[in-house]
Amino acid sequence: VGSNRCGVSPGKDAVALARLIAASAPLRFAGLHCYQGSAQHLRLPAERKTAIQEASKLAKEVRDALVAEGMACPRVTGAGTGTFLNECDSGIFDEVQAGSYIFMDRDYSENQLEANDLHFEHALFIQATVMSYPEPHRAVLDAGLKAFSVDSGMPAVWKRPDLKLTKASDEHGVLEVSD
């Protein structure tokens, strides 16, 4: 919502698109998809809450505008693992699409939580083997970009803060070993 990615802008553009969908014989307008992806990895709970409050306000305005024009808006769906409690609290969302919680990626673990927030644990790991130890503080693994993604930063070695993955190619990863 308002992230300038997919879809149309909240407001009159969203209402116009909903009208076009409703007027098209093979299509059925089923509601709004409102995902605030940029809020998922904001580190502080207050930042995530503020971002979702703003997005929820926009979603409510569009939903209310549709209803004011006599259009049913049976579903407002969206949310994500990093913010789903905020969306649930908003009273706007009928459906939550949180999906990362089932495995939990490394980047979500850097989000700070409130005392009563749900804490999801990592449930999916990649097993890699050290192939070589070319220097005392560097090890080469048999897992690289074809085994893990780096779009949110390098993976972490589970429960080993002394090991840091610093480089990756298609088939190999490089670990730096601290003293």
Which ranges hold each PLM region?
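Active-site loop/helix belt of alpha/beta enzymes
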Residues: G2-E114
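Short, structured beta-strand/loop micro-motifs enriched in basic residues and often containing a Trp
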Residues: L165-S178
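Active-site loop ensemble at the mouth of alpha/beta enzyme cores that anchors a bound cofactor
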Residues: R48-T50, T83-P161
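Gly/Ser/Thr-rich active-site loops/lids in small-molecule metabolic enzymes
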Residues: Q53-L58, A123, L163-K167
